[in-house]
Swiss-Prot record:
Biological role stated in the UniProt entry: Catalyzes the attachment of glutamate to tRNA(Glu) in a two-step reaction: glutamate is first activated by ATP to form Glu-AMP and then transferred to the acceptor end of tRNA(Glu).
InterPro entries, sorted: aa-tRNA-synth_I_cd-bd, aa-tRNA-synth_I_codon-bd_sub2, aa-tRNA-synth_I_CS, aa_tRNA-synth_I_cd-bd_sf, Glu-tRNA-ligase_bac/mito, Glu-tRNA-synth_I_codon-bd_sub1, Glu/Gln-tRNA-synth, Glu/Gln-tRNA-synth_Ib_cat-dom
GO biological process terms on file: glutamyl-tRNA aminoacylation
Enzyme class: ligase
Protein's name according to its UniProt entry: Glutamate--tRNA ligase 2
Motif extent ('KMSKS' region): 243-247
Quaternary structure (record): Monomer.
GO cellular component: cytosol
Species of the source: Thermoanaerobacter sp. (strain X514)
Residues engaged in binding ATP: K246
Source taxon at top rank: Bacteria
Main location: cytoplasm
Amino acid sequence: MSEVRVRFAPSPTGSLHIGGARTALFNWLFARHNGGKFILRVDDTDLQRSTEESMKGILEGLKWLGIDWDEGPIYQSQRLEEYRKFANKLLKEGKAYYCFCTKEELEEMRKQAEKEGRPPMYTGKCRNLTKEQIEEYLRQGKKPVIRLKVPQQGKTVVHDIIRGDVEFDNSTFDDFIIMKSDNMPTYNFATVVDDYQMGITHVIRAEEHLSNTPKQILIFEALGLEIPQFAHVSMVLAPDRSKLSKRHGATSVQEFRDQGYLPEAIVNYITLLGWIPKDGEEIFDVSKSIKEFTLERVSKNPAIYDVQKLTWINGHYIRNYDLDKLTEVVIPFLKAKNFIGEDFDYDYIKKIVSVVREREKTLVDVADAMSYYFTEVNEYEEKGVKKYFTKEKVVDILKKAVVTLKEVEPFNKFTTEETYRKLVEELQISSGELFHPTRLAISGRTFGPGLFDIMELLGKERTIKRIEKAIDFIQKMRK
């Protein structure tokens, strides 16, 4: 096999969404698996809708996911002369022609087709204009489009690596436009010229592009160019099997980033949207994907987007992430919540992260779970208050805890646990009668990391103050 060359060609008219990210990833994995090249091309010929901001977001999203490119970004808007050159070649060879039909004429054709129960197609009115007619129209200042002369008989077959052979009857295509009247190429024409000039060997893209493929093959054939191999990956659908949209929650890479998902988790999850490793495992790193990725193992069936599964995978990565790396990525979320400023104790934060990460699913969750280490506890969980602060002996138990904790030295998770266990025996109560109200008093919550981990991280003074504050709260509540 010659060198594999694939491309990802986003339009900078919006965000990098989960479907686009998966297309980029599958191309990248295929290139890396085969020791080939991954090219980033920008389909920005729609100048009105293309924005720099959108392009910046797409590039940042790819970098964040770890999808690096070997060539590019190559902008179509900077290659307009190339498209004109190839269009002129087709005109010269009689494989394309100028069309001067007005909007009104085209509308009339559409209405006539509708009347006759035919699909609306261009009738080929300008297909056989004489050289003199063309010159006269041009002299009048009419701006033509250029149409491809599509064979009116036969079939065009897409040999698809994932879907097998897909046949299209040429009679279903009209002589479609390849260059618009403003001298800009159409999507299909620019795509073919680019794929040829960039030496693309495999076109891996979403199933929604399958209907474009026969038109692109017809252009390749008219130009006498070698046709690349095609692979159309299935759509990513919402859980109700409808088209994925904003109403189904976050769908862009930037939104996932802002909501505290890790790039490794996103990459792991979107790889599963249509592909699975040989051993069937659902958690795997990118090196395994590169080693095993083949198009033959990509599913034909639609992939169902499941945010709960993504969140479960993200939780796995949070629990197993390198602690320093996790601390680094949590810090911006702590700043966003004003828990810390620019001046902070990195080692202290790292210790807290190490104890809270076991239960959390996103970086936002991790930051939220750290709140009571940086802010005062001013309210307590209602269900905890009802369950633990209303018990008859709770004030006496907590008062005894304060007295006992004042004597603990050094104050760490081992000494506090030993002290509390002795106190339980001394008071002849269950451990829950002491542990649960203490947790609620010092954190405001009924759940979280180990109680004695929390005590150690809060320190002696804050732990005691918070228990005293809770005693005060309970006594006022009882009045």
